[in-house]
């Protein structure tokens, strides 16, 4: 078992009282699983991701990664935010290396490997202002994976990109997953993206956020968004939103 999320609940304190954001979240991921999490705005998807990342310790329950209870960020977790968060004064290769020295041959070789994997050959010496948003997000992906984390956590990383760039980065991410078999938890609002990428879809309800349904996705890769089997699964997911009373708050 790579990741185990056990009975996780989360509360926020407000002037009007205590608000429960997450209620009794339980699910497990084996090594190499690709799980997408979808649900209405405000259902706690991003909050759950931050808890798994060790960025939020004020919760009930526990997160176990590779047999170790998580209480803070570590090399076990890679995190990709909605925005790339690159350092503008560092080049592409320096951003990927982050706090590691490119003078170290092992680090330099690893950076070179990831530059090739995310298809940024020739842009190693470029600065963030000199590359596109999609390229910047590829740098963020490479940076998060450089240390070979046990799980990669992605918080709507392609949400702000145009459709063409988003589609391209989906292919880049799938290529990485197929090569490295990194365990991934990917938060998205896009049902098609959830179906296209993952082998399991976790649907959350809101107020408080809890798991409404987990759907296994057994479509073979590469997936065709216009195929009958893809559309049938899309209908199945949409029906869960409708039957669960989620669709009114998800639009």
Curated annotation (Swiss-Prot):
Its main location: membrane. InterPro entries: AAA+_ATPase, ABC_transporter-like_ATP-bd, ABC_transporter-like_CS, ABC_transporter_ATP-bind, P-loop_NTPase. It is found in: Cell membrane. One of its GO terms (molecular function) is ATP hydrolysis activity. This is Aliphatic sulfonates import ATP-binding protein SsuB. The complex is composed of two ATP-binding proteins (SsuB), two transmembrane proteins (SsuC) and a solute-binding protein (SsuA). It comes from Bacillus thuringiensis subsp. konkukian (strain 97-27). PROSITE patterns: ABC_TRANSPORTER_1, ABC_TRANSPORTER_2, SSUB. It is an enzyme of class 7 (translocase). Residues 3-231 form the ABC transporter domain. Part of the ABC transporter complex SsuABC involved in aliphatic sulfonates import. Responsible for energy coupling to the transport system. It holds the Pfam family ABC_tran. Belongs to the ABC transporter superfamily. Aliphatic sulfonates importer (TC 3.A.1.17.2) family.
């Amino acid at each position: 078992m790579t990741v185990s999320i056990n009975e996780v609940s989360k509360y926020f304190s407000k002037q009007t009282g205590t608000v429960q954001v997450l209620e009794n979240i339980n699910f497990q991921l084996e090594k190499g699983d690709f799980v997408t999490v979808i649900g209405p705005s405000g259902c706690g998807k991003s909050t759950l991701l931050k808890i798994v990342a060790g960025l939020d310790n004020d919760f009930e329950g526990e997160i176990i990664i590779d047999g170790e209870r998580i209480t803070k960020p570590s090399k076990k977790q890679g995190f990709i935010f909605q925005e790339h968060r690159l350092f503008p004064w560092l080049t592409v290769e320096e951003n990927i290396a982050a706090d590691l020295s490119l003078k170290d041959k092992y680090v330099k070789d690893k950076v070179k490997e990831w530059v090739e994997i995310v298809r940024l050959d020739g842009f190693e010496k470029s600065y963030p202002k000199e590359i596109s948003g999609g390229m910047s997000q590829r740098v963020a992906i490479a940076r998060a994976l450089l240390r070979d984390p046990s799980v990669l956590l992605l918080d709507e990383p392609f949400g702000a990109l145009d459709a063409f760039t988003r589609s391209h980065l989906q292919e880049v991410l799938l290529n990485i997953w197929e090569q490295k078999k990194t365990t991934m938890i990917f938060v998205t609002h896009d049902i098609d993206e959830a179906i296209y990428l993952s082998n399991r879809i976790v649907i959350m309800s809101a107020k408080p956020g809890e798991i409404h349904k987990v759907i296994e996705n057994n479509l073979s890769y590469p997936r065709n968004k216009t195929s009958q089997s893809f559309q049938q699964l899309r209908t199945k997911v949409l029906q869960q939103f409708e039957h669960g009373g989620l669709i009114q708050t998800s639009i």
